[in-house]
A protein has these predicted regions:
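Non-catalytic, well-ordered alpha-helical scaffold segments
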Residues: 58-62, 99-102, 122-125, 209-213, ...
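Non-membrane alpha-helical structural segments and their capping/turn regions in soluble enzymes
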Residues: 23-30, 122-125, 282
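Short capping/connector residues at structural and topological boundaries
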Residues: 54, 69, 75-78, 84, ...
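N-terminal Rossmann-like or analogous alpha/beta NTP/dinucleotide-binding catalytic cores
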Residues: 1-105, 223, 262-264, 268, ...
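Conserved nucleotide- and phosphate/pyrophosphate-binding catalytic cores
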Residues: 129-327
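Internal, conserved structured core segments that host functional sites
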Residues: 77-81, 85-135, 139, 160-161
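Active-site-proximal beta-alpha loop/turn segments in soluble metabolic enzymes
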Residues: 15-18, 109-113, 167-168
Length: 327
């Protein structure tokens, strides 16, 4: 459907709340790249790149900052939620506070028409759209206003962490990682948050807000019941039994574990093969970063041209100044 696909590893953004631990960010770059590639990303069809290796993004952010007020950033629901989650309170790093502007640069630099995100990122995309409209109204049509692309499966809009308290996040340590061993996955699934009032098997259970059922909504298919839980035809039947009582959390968690293990097994196998040639992964990232930089440089050139700050390329400006000072 898309002529070009750019996928960014946001190491510079990660530094906004890891400035004192750059080694952590550095080490995670290869982990993220392995995750993307093991899930099937084809570098021949998509451009995988590292944010910090495209300095044009930083320059674009600097220009966009003049189009956004502090008050507008403070009203961004995603920013407010992230600040609360990280307990920054009155010590918010400036880089973190302004990351919606940085994200606007990440999107507009590649003339993106579509941005696939979870629902929690909708305010960020809307802020990008505002920046695009503001820039174009001041300097003329230059930037592309992107559309948001949400998952068809509503359960995938925002997967909660296994603790049930927030979205799944590496920084919060409530994730199931693609690199986890089968035993790691099993332990995490068996420790998942469910309904705290579902104490005995006979107790009626709550499905809404129950992590286990949220993950089943996201990953479970009818054929899984044939293989792992033949007493039920589909997920609706399982939910109804849980809600009326008589179905224990352990049984449901064991089923989810089987579902996730089946989903993750081919990913783990591909990852194991990719790990055998790490220099090749860096080659992919280098080639992708070079391609991304070329694209971003073109957009930056157009932005500076629209703003009339392309001094050395502006023959008319040079001529006018020459005439002014020759009198």
């Amino acid at each position: 459907e898309y002529d070009e696909i750019y996928i960014m590893i946001a190491d510079a953004q990660a530094l906004t709340d890891n400035a004192e631990n750059p080694g952590k960010v550095r080490d995670n770059i290869i982990e993220v790249a392995l995750d993307y590639l093991s899930c099937g990303l084809d570098p021949a069809k998509s451009t995988l790149f590292i944010q910090s290796q495209v300095p044009e993004l930083t320059e674009l952010s600097f220009y966009y900052m003049n189009l956004v007020t502090v008050a507008r950033l403070q009203r961004n629901p995603t920013v407010k939620s992230e600040i609360q989650m990280r307990k920054f309170e009155n010590s918010i790093p400036v880089g973190f506070f302004t990351y919606p502007i940085s994200q606007a640069s990440d999107i507009t630099a590649f003339k993106a028409t579509t941005v696939p995100v979870g629902e929690d990122q909708e305010p960020m995309i809307e802020q990008t759209r505002e920046i695009v409209r503001k820039f174009n109204s001041v300097y003329g049509d230059t930037l592309v206003e992107p559309e948001i692309l949400l998952p068809d499966n509503k359960a995938c809009l925002r997967l909660p962490g296994i603790d049930g308290k927030a979205k799944m996040s590496k920084s919060l340590g409530n994730c199931i990682y693609l690199s986890d061993t089968p035993e790691d996955v099993r332990k995490k699934v068996m420790s998942m948050y469910t309904d705290p009032n579902h104490i005995q098997v006979s107790d009626p259970g709550q499905v809404e807000g129950n992590c286990v059922f949220t993950y089943l909504d996201a990953f479970c298919k009818e054929e899984h019941f044939e293989r792992y839980l033949p007493d039920y035809k589909n997920l609706d039947e399982l939910k109804e039994h849980y809600k009326r009582g008589g179905l224990g959390d352990v049984k449901v968690k064991k089923f989810l574990n089987n579902v996730l293990q089946e989903e993750l097994e081919p990913i783990r196998a591909r990852r194991a093969e990719l790990e055998k040639d790490i220099p090749a992964i860096f080659d992919i990232l280098k080639a992708g970063s070079e391609k991304a930089q070329a694209k971003a440089a073109q957009t930056l050139h157009e932005v500076k041209d629209a703003m009339r700050i392309n001094y050395f390329d502006d023959a008319e400006l040079i001529q006018k100044q020459a005439e002014k000072y020759s009198k």
